[in-house]
Amino acid sequence: MNDQLTAIYTELLLMKEELQSRLFEYSCFQVSTSPQAAINQKQKATLIYHIKEELQDVLLALSKIENGTFGYCEETGAPIPLAKLAVLPTARTANDFLYSVQFEKKTLPIWKSTDIEYGQALYE
């Protein structure tokens, strides 16, 4: 493992530790029946969901480093430069570095048929 990959691996380990501690922190909340508490619980549930998503990405990147498959685009198989991966170590494809893709990924929710309607969710 070269120095650049070792630095990325170390960064991912730190990210994993931080995300696990944040997940534990937000998972330990008390149940209350007040309307304000219900809103706070929804916010915490959303935070927990995003933390779990990030943690899965970090664990996948760590696994790829350990297996020797880190740094290759999952769509094309083309190598991704380590300089780019140093900035975004959880990237899975070359498209992950495009601003527009990242913007849509972080801001637009993915709705399932069981979820509430999009317009309704915006105003709750």
Swiss-Prot record:
It comes from the Bacteria. Keywords: Metal-binding, Zinc, Zinc-finger. InterPro entries: Tscrpt_reg_DksA-rel_prd (IPR016841), Znf_DskA_TraR (IPR000962), Znf_DskA_TraR_CS (IPR020458). GO terms for molecular function: zinc ion binding. A zinc finger (dksA C4-type) spans 73-94. PANTHER family: DNAK SUPPRESSOR PROTEIN, RNA POLYMERASE-BINDING TRANSCRIPTION FACTOR DKSA-RELATED. This is Uncharacterized protein YlyA.
